[in-house]
Amino acid sequence: MSRSLVLAIETSCDETAVAVLRSPREILASEIASQIDLHRKYGGVVPEVASRNHLPRIRPLIEAALRRSGSSLAEIDCVAATRGPGLLTSLLVGYSAAKGLAIGLGKPFIGVNHLEGHLLSPFLQGPDRPLPSVNLIVSGGHTMLVQIIGVGSYTLLGRTVDDAAGEAFDKVAKLLELPYPGGPEIDRLAQQGNPRKFDLPRSMLNSGDFNFSFSGLKTAVRYLLPKLDGDFCADLCASFQEAVIDVLVQKTIRAAKRFGVNLVTVSGGVSANSRLRTKMTDASAAAGLELKLACPSLSTDNAAMIAFAALERFQLGYRSNLSDDADPNLKLV
């Protein structure tokens, strides 16, 4: 049986990414052009700057991905791109480029939900795992628990009611005047600190549901800062990080037990956090659950996960309508 080739483009935020994937899950190329240096002086992503800088990078990245994969456009079986959610002006760059390619080549086109890409990314490493599973998506823009029944069949178990976990990391990093991006910097400093030095709130830890809240934790850090002096940064980073991760880990394990699921998966940019990976590994083992973590290179935004989600849908016969537009508020469930 012939193996399908998918070319996918991801431009939902500030990373320009192109990947070529061969079924069932062989990453032939995964090219990423980062804009971190461009946005560092602003302390965060500026949408107009992001979209303008996607434009000159798309074609060179497509060409680079094809060269690295040893493939030609004629060999591509399906073209895919992130449809949403994300920054509209950024989404439009990759989505329009992919639709144009699909039309020009006469190939099927699939618009992919960015969150579905994250959701399925732990499975990209293989081998297959039995479903259903409970997945924690934890990133700068989203924090949610989702039960995966099968490809395209998802149940939302809980989500943040205010800030996403990654957003809380970024905001606390700004309060501490840490370099951008703040999340990895907090992770680095926390490894040198005492996670029990400061008693910070674990909001909604015992709420009885699977929702999250991190804005109160951020506010607690803001009110604590004026009272501190000396060399407190590492301890505060460790204490803040521990508070976030305690809630993420405990609610994920409880959800798996509540719904009788034996497999837990974790994905999204914050899943690269070293403390989260350690504590989720330990908690899953203690609960007798199997754990699948997206590898760090597939945790942050990338086109390989978009290609994989597209491939899974392509093989089920799904095709997108070329008249569909990018949707910055696209829902997963």
Each predicted region: which residue ranges?
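N-terminal beta-alpha supersecondary unit
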Residues: 4-85, 114, 118
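Short Gly/Thr/Asp-enriched flexible loops that form oxyanion-binding sites at enzyme active sites
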Residues: 81-105, 274-283
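A contiguous, well-structured pocket-lining segment that forms one wall/lid of small-molecule binding clefts
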Residues: 72, 188-264, 274-287, 314
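Short, acidic/small-residue loops that bind anionic groups at enzyme active sites
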Residues: 98-119, 288-293
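Short glycine-rich phosphate-binding loop at a beta-alpha junction
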Residues: 72-83, 259-270, 292-295
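A short helix-loop
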Residues: 2-5, 11-12, 19, 29-30, ...
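Conserved phosphate-binding catalytic cores of ATP/NTP-utilizing and phosphoryl-transfer enzymes
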Residues: 1-3, 112-134, 309
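Conserved phosphate-binding/catalytic loops in two-lobed NTP-binding clefts
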Residues: 111-112, 281-305, 320
